[in-house]
Amino acid sequence: MMSYLKQPPYGMNGLGLAGPAMDLLHPSVGYPATPRKQRRERTTFTRSQLDVLEALFAKTRYPDIFMREEVALKINLPESRVQVWFKNRRAKCRQQQQSGNGTKTRPVKKKSSPVRESSGSESSGQFTPPAVSSSASSSSSASSASANPAAAAAAGLGGNPVAAASSLSTPTASSIWSPASISPGSAPTSVSVPEPLAAPSNASCMQRSVAAGAATAAASYPMSYGQGGSYGQGYPAPSSSYFGGVDCSSYLAPMHSHHHPHQLSPMAPSSMAGHHHHHPHAHHPLSQSSGHHHHHHHHHHHQGYGGSGLAFNSADCLDYKEPAAAAASSAWKLNFNSPDCLDYKDQASWRFQVL
């Protein structure tokens, strides 16, 4: 700070107290632009500057550094101000859109990307519907595969149906569950889940997976599962811990023992449960997320995404969980639908991956 403040007398002032004061006192110092002050003066744009900025905004909502620098030179402002202006402009756009101004579709784009990245709330909001649809599709497939899944679930997961019933709040969930546990159902499930793994939403995916894993595990161990499912919702982020905290731990143990020890992580257990019968690779951390994917995809190995999922798992899980928790709660249990929802976008990709 001091270096910025050319005049010692105001050194303390600028430093501790009043960045603005400094500004006012030494406008010529150039202090406003670069130094890190407690507070920066509000940047006021002239009409001509705004015209230039708006023109670029009309062209692209996300100008790259070169575009921003070019405009910054044109309007004689630091590039950082240009960047912030665009950030705020996009936010304004989004707000207008949300408040019922549907004319601008660009904001949507913006929204989804964050979703993809990690905005739990947005994602959950946006993707929850997809989750629902996924669950619907899953459930339909589930129903079609119903007899199968039921039998398979019963056979493969043992408690699966029960678990599903208990953990899932909704029928869909249960149907989904079965599918999730079963390959037939899995296709849809995987669909929902797949994408997540692929993308950052992976994280959410992970979560889902975790949930899925839990669910799966639950399927295997119906009792724990019920709790696991809910816990999962509760503590999506820490998948492992969540498993641990949840009955998952119990699953874990059982799963582990039951499954291949190689399951790597707690998540693995859940996925294990999901696919104990499946291959170990399913068991990666991802396995959680793939937990249920796994089952669907056992064939397709989720390991790939498993790994990534894992990472996200912990992180994203939280976000998604919260936002999606309510809606997803059933979904999660179901099949992380809602979590998947988060990844819905990804879902599509996942699907492909999975399928």
Swiss-Prot record:
Residue spans of biased composition, Basic residues class: 274-284, 291-303
DNA-binding region: 38-97
Compartments where located: Nucleus
GO MF: DNA-binding transcription activator activity, RNA polymerase II-specific; RNA polymerase II cis-regulatory region sequence-specific DNA binding
Signal peptide (from-to): none
Feature: compositional bias, Polar residues: 94-104
Any single Pfam family the record assigns to this protein: TF_Otx
Alphabetized SMART domains for the sequence: HOX
Major location (coarse): nucleus
SUPFAM superfamilies assigned: Homeodomain-like
Tissue-specificity statement: Brain: restricted regions of the developing rostral brain including the presumptive cerebral cortex and olfactory bulbs; expressed in the developing olfactory, auricolar and ocular systems, including the covering of the optic nerve.
Region (Disordered): 91-144, 257-306
Matching PANTHER family: HOMEOBOX PROTEIN, HOMEOBOX PROTEIN OTX1
Protein's recorded name: Homeobox protein OTX1
Species, as recorded: Mus musculus
Gene name of the record: Otx1
